[in-house]
Amino acid sequence: MLEQPYLDLAKKVLDEGHFKPDRTHTGTYSIFGHQMRFDLSKGFPLLTTKKVPFGLIKSELLWFLHGDTNIRFLLQHRNHIWDEWAFEKWVKSDEYHGPDMTDFGHRSQKDPEFAAVYHEEMAKFDDRVLHDDAFAAKYGDLGLVYGSQWRAWHTSKGDTIDQLGDVIEQIKTHPYSRRLIVSAWNPEDVPTMALPPCHTLYQFYVNDGKLSLQLYQRSADIFLGVPFNIASYALLTHLVAHECGLEVGEFIHTFGDAHLYVNHLDQIKEQLSRTPRPAPTLQLNPDKHDIFDFDMKDIKLLNYDPYPAIKAPVAV
């Protein structure tokens, strides 16, 4: 089955992973250096052993492709993946006068009473981002995140580089170039970033009329994050191939630190007990070619029949 490389990775970390303390104080079992390969001609690699919300993956990738860095677009599509990063900026500001939100990530997981207050404040924050332009501009914008790095990389000269746009043009004109690379890792920015890029670099490769993509991911949350990452970069491969008139080849996923959080072990064991089902297929709007013009309705997933979702706490 198409998702078997993911299941093999999870089992390997369960069997061979080294225990490590981590930034979130949760603890992980990890391995260093691993690679998965997915043949995209055999289906779309959205996991079937648990339900993965493809709508969130679509809206997040479109957010990146548009070069957007403000969570308003995500909120308009009921996507809350990036809420906490913007909310943190708000509650640390001099303008915030609500309940104490210090260390809200950990406290909301351990204290049900605080969690209720936190969710109420987050709902108020999201509503203001959606309906107050000035507030959204100040507190909804995340700055140097993937959309900015891919589409408007800031140079030391004060201008910007559209890395992804430039690479797509190179694929069309020089498909066999070995420089078809988009990087999100800027050492100058890392010390001041809320979360340095986990997906640090990806490279395209053209052969026999097929487009492949390899991602290097420095840090990977195997249970919660990696299923999203696989589908997101597989979708990106499809979209770029679509614009460039190519078929899809492989998505190759290379990891640095690939880890399972201690509080995800029961969940991944439950997932590994399930037998994978046939992979779904992807359908793109044939009447659109510029991927930067795509919207939600232009991307459809067909024949997705997953097992139920498995809930797990997010390490923050």
UniProtKB/Swiss-Prot annotation:
One Gene Ontology term of the molecular function aspect: thymidylate synthase activity
Enzyme's top EC category: transferase
Pathway: Pyrimidine metabolism; dTTP biosynthesis
Pfam families (UniProt xref): Thymidylat_synt
Ligand binding (dUMP): 23, 178-179, 218-221, 229, 259-261
Keywords on record: Cytoplasm, Methyltransferase, Nucleotide biosynthesis, Transferase
Residues at the active site: 198 (nucleophile)
Gene3D superfamilies for the chain: Thymidylate synthase/dCMP hydroxymethylase domain
Predominant location category: cytoplasm
GO CC annotation terms, alphabetical: cytosol
InterPro entries in the record: Thymidate_synth/dCMP_Mease, Thymidate_synth/dCMP_Mease_dom, Thymidate_synth/dCMP_Mease_sf, Thymidylate_synthase, Thymidylate_synthase_AS
Localization, UniProt: Cytoplasm
The name this protein goes by in its record: Thymidylate synthase
Organism per entry: Lacticaseibacillus casei (Lactobacillus casei)
